[in-house]
UniProtKB/Swiss-Prot annotation:
One of its GO terms (cellular component) is riboflavin synthase complex. Catalyzes the formation of 6,7-dimethyl-8-ribityllumazine by condensation of 5-amino-6-(D-ribitylamino)uracil with 3,4-dihydroxy-2-butanone 4-phosphate. This is the penultimate step in the biosynthesis of riboflavin. The keyword Transferase applies. PANTHER family: 6,7-DIMETHYL-8-RIBITYLLUMAZINE SYNTHASE, 6,7-DIMETHYL-8-RIBITYLLUMAZINE SYNTHASE DMRL SYNTHASE LUMAZINE SYNTHASE. This is 6,7-dimethyl-8-ribityllumazine synthase. HAMAP family: Lumazine_synth (MF_00178). Pathway: Cofactor biosynthesis; riboflavin biosynthesis; riboflavin from 2-hydroxy-3-oxobutyl phosphate and 5-amino-6-(D-ribitylamino)uracil: step 1/2. It is an enzyme of class 2 (transferase). GO terms for biological process: riboflavin biosynthetic process. Keywords: Riboflavin biosynthesis, Transferase. 5-amino-6-(D-ribitylamino)uracil binds at F18, A49, L50, E51, C75, V76, I77, N108.
């Protein structure tokens, strides 16, 4: 369900490249939705999911470019250590902090899965691609912000 907007929003896709092929699929899904919606977007890459919220915060403070919303894309696969919980929990918490405390429109497409098979099931085009869902969510949140008076 592509959002119909009365404005031409500009979004930033922040993509973690830790799992390159999975990231490619998530990005393709997000880009497809944004292109079909007729909005403009930029893409930046970061090393991993933990860096996504910081990149969004940096972009938000930049006064030379304005983004109406953000799409966070990445993949965290459980390993043998506690690192999975740290990355999954803290990247999600930091995105929620940005959403709630700074009122940013963010679509979260960071996969947090048990194994690579689950990641592919959520990243492949034409299936349950979470990149498209994240882009749709960002567009929806931009529309809600406009509805409730954010006229930037």
């Amino acid at each position: 369900m592509t959002q119909k907007l009365h404005i031409n929003p500009h979004l930033l896709i922040v993509e973690a490249r830790f799992y390159n092929e999975i990231s490619d699929e998530l990005l393709a899904g997000a880009v497809s939705v944004l292109q079909k919606s007729g909005v403009s977007y930029d893409i930046i890459t970061v090393p991993g999911a933990l860096e996504i919220p910081a990149a969004i915060a940096f972009a938000e403070k930049d006064k030379t470019v304005f983004y109406d919303g953000y799409v966070a894309l990445g993949c965290v696969i459980r390993g043998e250590t506690y690192h999975f919980e740290i990355v999954a929990d803290n990247s999600c918490r930091a995105l929620m902090d940005l959403t709630v405390h700074q009122q940013l429109a963010i679509g979260n497409g960071i996969l947090t899965v048990e194994n690579e098979k689950q990641a592919w099931a959520r990243a492949k085009q034409g299936e349950k691609n979470k990149g498209d869902f994240a882009a749709e969510a960002a567009l929806c949140m931009i529309a809600l912000k406009k509805r409730f008076g954010d006229n930037r």
